[in-house]
Amino acid sequence: MTAHIISGTAVAKQVKANIAEQIQAYTAQDKRKPGLAVILVGMDPASQVYVNSKRKSCAEIGIESKSYDLPAETGEAELLAIIEQLNHDDSVDGILVQLPLPKQIDATKVTEAIVPHKDVDGFHPYNVGRLCQKIPTLRSCTPYGVMKLLESTGVNLAGLHAVVVGASNIVGRPMAMELLLAGCTVTVTHSRTKDLAYHVSQADIVVAGVGKPNFVKGEWIKPGAIVIDVGINRVEGKLIGDVEYSAAEAKASFITPVPGGVGPMTVAMLMQNTLQAYQVHLQAV
């Protein structure tokens, strides 16, 4: 068996085309464009790449992007003041603060300072809580993107056993909630999990997000499983995932590549969340 490749690039292109079409329909009625404020603190090279990708997507689909590039020594109070100003700016529908932040800034405080209806990253406790209660509004972009990729396979997820490798706030925890919402039986593994290989070998769906290259071994994969690799690791100048790709591809029914799998979907779902926040904002005016 050789797995079908789930192209995040192709699915993301469809998602963004649909968003662009909806924005054109609004602007044709003399409505303003959606607005996304993107805040970058410091010059972390990986963060710059991610932020530029988000700004480029905004330009492509008709979202007005507002850039706030702040020096690395920016204080917490200064950043919170900018967020407070954007919270009250009617031309801004979404606020994104690129993580990680410099050590002098408390990321939790920053996340909670963004009003929930502009939290297009889906990190605010209010939005995470909505997902936990089965009434999601703005959803965490990477897990939301993973669900779109799973949807693209045409496989009915209800009743399948999903194993999430990694329990981070950004991927693992909201991912488990998304899979639960889709009717999966969910196991979450983490750094203290015993016999990880056994848990992975039981999975109909494996979602790996630990940030360790080739951490999930191909031999652990159950024949016919769906494998979603969230990891992006640079090794000897190449990008590789958290899953041992070639060995897993030989056993899986579907698999995402790295790059070109989950990465493009994270940006696409950020655009989707921005459109959703914009639509809610328009209705409230």
UniProtKB/Swiss-Prot annotation:
Its EC number is 1.5.1.5, 3.5.4.9. This is Bifunctional protein FolD. It catalyses: (6R)-5,10-methylene-5,6,7,8-tetrahydrofolate + NADP(+) = (6R)-5,10-methenyltetrahydrofolate + NADPH; (6R)-5,10-methenyltetrahydrofolate + H2O = (6R)-10-formyltetrahydrofolate + H(+). Belongs to the tetrahydrofolate dehydrogenase/cyclohydrolase family. It holds the Pfam family THF_DHG_CYH_C. The lineage of its organism: Bacteria, Pseudomonadati, Pseudomonadota, Gammaproteobacteria, Pasteurellales. Homodimer. Catalyzes the oxidation of 5,10-methylenetetrahydrofolate to 5,10-methenyltetrahydrofolate and then the hydrolysis of 5,10-methenyltetrahydrofolate to 10-formyltetrahydrofolate. NADP(+) binds at residues 166-168, 191, 232. One of its GO terms (biological process) is tetrahydrofolate interconversion. One of its GO terms (molecular function) is methenyltetrahydrofolate cyclohydrolase activity. Disulfide bonds: none annotated. Keywords: Amino-acid biosynthesis, Histidine biosynthesis, Hydrolase, Methionine biosynthesis, Multifunctional enzyme, NADP, One-carbon metabolism, Oxidoreductase, Purine biosynthesis. GO terms for cellular component: cytosol. The keyword ATP-binding does not apply. Pathway: One-carbon metabolism; tetrahydrofolate interconversion. The keyword Transmembrane helix does not apply.
